[in-house]
Amino acid sequence: MKQRPTGPDTTPRNRRGFGRDTAVASVCGLVVALMVGASYAAVPFYNWFCRVTGFNGTTQVAAAAPQGGALKRTIAVRFDSNTNGLPWSFAPETTEIEIPIGQVTTVYYKVTNRAAHETTGQAAYNVAPLTVGAYFQKINCFCFTDQTLGPHETRELPVVFYVDPALATDSDNDTLNSITLSYTFYPLRSAAPKPLAASEAGPRQGAL
């Protein structure tokens, strides 16, 4: 006669172990999903925070000239240009100017598409030192929209800005005598051509 096994039955324990492993895997998957979702949500929040506060050298957008006019104190503004992954030549028409704080000023960048086909780019920007981002106000800028250039096309791109007079009351910037405005154009792979803004399509106006 065959004898039945006398050892303990481990089947329930194995089932409990399998269920515990499944629960742990589910919790880990949920945590990963939440982390990915949070990272995507953090990007627009960070961009909004930078625009509102000027953090990390992010400039501000102004609707009009400041109240009260320009101050006697002047400041030098330097202009920097870069491209990343685009067959473009991109440079400011002047590398440095000195302006009264609060004075609305227009400068131009020149860009040329060296490729034999249409290309589209978007300009990222910041100012240095980073503490002046909240005071650098742009009224109009080519960085507000995508830029599409035809084969070998050259275009002049305006920037209309002023340095907020509130800078003069900021004790942290008492010794500040220069600001650098920097742009970098990046490619947009699948962007559709867009019509030029009215300020860019018309004849060049204004002077430094």
Swiss-Prot record:
<feature type="transmembrane region" description="Helical; Signal-anchor for type II membrane protein">
    <location>
        <begin position="20"/>
        <end position="42"/>
    </location>
</feature>
<dbReference type="GO" id="GO:0005507">
    <property type="term" value="F:copper ion binding"/>
</dbReference>
<keyword id="KW-0735">Signal-anchor</keyword>
<keyword id="KW-1133">Transmembrane helix</keyword>
<dbReference type="Pfam" id="PF04442">
    <property type="entry name" value="CtaG_Cox11"/>
</dbReference>
<dbReference type="GO" id="GO:0008535">
    <property type="term" value="P:respiratory chain complex IV assembly"/>
</dbReference>
<feature type="topological domain" description="Cytoplasmic">
    <location>
        <begin position="1"/>
        <end position="19"/>
    </location>
</feature>
<dbReference type="InterPro" id="IPR023471">
    <property type="entry name" value="CtaG/Cox11_dom_sf"/>
</dbReference>
<keyword id="KW-0812">Transmembrane</keyword>
<comment type="function">
    <text>Exerts its effect at some terminal stage of cytochrome c oxidase synthesis, probably by being involved in the insertion of the copper B into subunit I.</text>
</comment>
<keyword id="KW-0186">Copper</keyword>
<keyword id="KW-0997">Cell inner membrane</keyword>
<comment type="similarity">
    <text>Belongs to the COX11/CtaG family.</text>
</comment>
<dbReference type="InterPro" id="IPR007533">
    <property type="entry name" value="Cyt_c_oxidase_assmbl_CtaG"/>
</dbReference>
<dbReference type="GO" id="GO:0005886">
    <property type="term" value="C:plasma membrane"/>
</dbReference>
<feature type="topological domain" description="Periplasmic">
    <location>
        <begin position="43"/>
        <end position="208"/>
    </location>
</feature>
<protein>
    <recommendedName>
        <fullName>Cytochrome c oxidase assembly protein CtaG</fullName>
    </recommendedName>
</protein>
<keyword id="KW-0472">Membrane</keyword>
<keyword id="KW-1003">Cell membrane</keyword>
